[in-house]
Swiss-Prot record:
InterPro entries in the cross-refs: Class_I_gatase-like, CTP_synthase, CTP_synthase_N, GATASE, GATase1_CTP_Synthase, P-loop_NTPase
Enzyme Commission number(s): 6.3.4.2
Protein name as catalogued: CTP synthase
Binding site for Mg(2+): 71, 141
Species for this entry: Oceanobacillus iheyensis (strain DSM 14371 / CIP 107618 / JCM 11309 / KCTC 3954 / HTE831)
Length: 535
């Protein structure tokens, strides 16, 4: 029978609930259990697809094309699984589903209420996550903080699930903060006590409490928390700040959270073999070289907007014993002199995905500088589109070439709308989303990066595409179309001939990178950047 773990948070946000949930998932997977994981977000947006990166950070795209919370990236990277559309549920999505059912008459004229209709819909989403994957364990993170009005329907739903499936099949893990008061020279447990009291007032008794802390927590303090929160002191778990995220699963194993979980469910599972993971942590802590990458974007004040890109660069660095240092370069503020000054300091240039016209000229000029000065360049999604525009302008001679997204009246729309996108009016959920195959061309850097694979599969999130009207004209000047859709219609990867490493792709390879298995194009890019640094 499927087991359900619910991870809640108290006191403050950004405690690391997502990392805790992902780490526990990794430990249980390494014990031989199949695991899936999901996140409930209490905001009323249907999904984060149309939200500003300043508000929400990056949008993580799943294999089946769902636009989701960035925590799903942590889940996939830690547990090494592919998630799906059931893995991120928002209040907006729940209410949309219930309202559609009401309009269809599914409720037979009854009054539609938060309880039972909204809570039943939430419970259905939990159960679907398990049914879709056949997982032994479903881990659900509840976004927000206990006490928030927005989270109440979710907390009520997970309270009810204990009655639906039996108390032996449900476990509640509560994450809280134990602050250190510098003036008093001591840590305080009161916030944790009050947070658990609030949770218990909603009918949920935590089975384990994870304490986020800067310093070691004494046995006496654990016993005090256990006493006031009515929990076994062995189930009070210390989670100290770590120098790398990938240390957290090891720390939680040392605190025996996975064993406590197995005991709670009555599961007899072998000890989790974490030797490979410990090797990863040891490697991360002892990198001997440094490579500098210039990331040119418009959301550089908020690194979470490019979280998966940053993690993928780091993963690739691990394979080269290299610590990747990122230089955040704001494309809106780049003058010609600044481009030379900033990019002369780096070993590689990356232009990631994005939307809109802000900062476009700075990105195009950065791409030109990388191309003309033989600096390794990697473009992703918008980065590929702008690399095409730059080449069309400065090599082919189409000085007014542009993307139709940025300038709908350009005489040379090198980048244009996909035909199926031309009559779409809604922004949300209407992009080309999810995993699609790409056929690679022999003798190209893209095919070399993928170890000679003929066809690869990567995730997409875009509305515009390379305009095939310009394909022959650009190919004649050394623009290489190294990957296309299997039917040859859509351009997926491009390169520049006779450049040490100038590769760009329409898809988002950052979504498939793993800490123990770097994504192929990122690995190729960092390898080229390491070589560039050597001179």
């Amino acid at each position: 029978m499927t087991k359900y773990i619910f991870v809640t948070g108290g006191v403050v946000s950004s405690l690391g609930k997502g990392i805790t949930a992902a780490s526990l998932g990794r430990l249980l997977k390494n014990r031989g259990l199949s695991v899936t994981i999901q996140k409930f977000d209490p905001y009323i947006n249907v999904d984060p697809g149309t939200m500003s990166p300043y508000q929400h950070g990056e949008v993580f795209v799943t294999q089946d094309g769902a636009e989701t919370d960035l925590d799903l990236g942590h889940y996939e990277r830690f547990i090494d699984i592919n998630l799906n559309k059931y893995s991120n549920i928002t209040t907006g999505k729940v209410y949309s589903s219930v309202i559609r059912k009401e309009r269809r008459g599914d409720y037979l004229g009854g009054t539609v209420q938060v309880i039972p209709h909204i809570t039943n819909e939430i419970k259905d989403q939990v159960f679907r996550a398990g049914e879709a994957t056949g997982a032994d364990v479903v881990i659900t993170e509840i976004g927000g903080t206990v006490g928030d009005i927005e989270s109440l329907p979710f907390l009520e739903a997970i309270r009810q699930i204990k009655s639906d499936v039996g108390r032996d099949s449900v476990m509640y893990v509560h994450c809280t903060l134990v602050p250190y008061i510098k003036a008093a020279g001591e840590m305080k447990t009161k916030p944790t006590q009050h947070s658990v009291k609030e949770l218990r007032s909603l009918g949920i008794q935590p089975d384990a409490i994870v304490l986020r802390t800067e310093m070691a927590i004494s046995k006496d303090m654990k016993e005090k928390i256990a006493l006031f929160c009515d929990i076994d002191d062995k189930s009070v778990i210390e989670m100290r700040d770590a120098d790398t995220l990938y240390q957290v699963p090891i720390a939680l194993q040392e605190e025996k959270l996975d064993q406590i979980t197995c005991n709670h469910f009555g599961l007899d599972c072998p000890e989790a073999d974490m030797e490979e993971w410990k090797g990863l942590v040891n490697k991360v802590r002892n990198l001997s070289k440094t490579t500098h990458i210039g990331l040119v974007g418009k959301y550089v004040e908020l690194p979470d907007a490019y979280l998966s890109v940053v993690e993928s660069l780091k993963h690739a660095g691990y394979d080269y014993d290299t610590d990747v240092k990122i230089h955040w370069i704001n494309s809106e503020l780049l003058s010609e002199e600044q481009i030379k000054e900033e990019l002369s300091k780096v070993d590689g240039v990356l232009v990631p995905g994005g939307f809109g016209d802000r900062g476009i000229d700075g990105k195009i000029e950065a791409i030109r500088y990388a191309r003309e000065n033989n600096i390794p360049f990697f473009g992703i999604c918008l980065g590929m589109q702008l690399a095409s525009v730059e080449f069309a302008r400065n090599v082919v001679g189409l000085s007014q070439a542009h993307s139709a997204e940025i300038n709908p009246h350009t005489p040379h729309p090198v980048i244009d709308l996909l035909p199926e996108q031309k009559d779409i009016e809604d922004l949300g959920g209407t992009l080309r989303l999810g995993a699609y195959p790409c056929k690679l061309v022999d003798g190209t850097k893209a095919k070399e990066a993928y170890d000679g694979a003929d066809v690869i599969e990567e995730r997409h999130r875009h509305r515009y595409e390379f305009n095939n009207v310009y394909r022959d004209q650009m190919a004649e000047k050394g623009f290489v179309f190294s990957g296309t859709s299997p039917d040859g219609r859509l351009v997926e990867t491009i390169e520049v001939k006779d450049h040490p490493w100038f590769v760009a792709c329409q898809f988002h390879p950052e979504f498939t990178s793993r800490p123990t298995r770097a994504q192929s194009l990122f690995k190729g890019f960092i390898g080229a950047s390491v070589d560039y640094r050597k001179g």
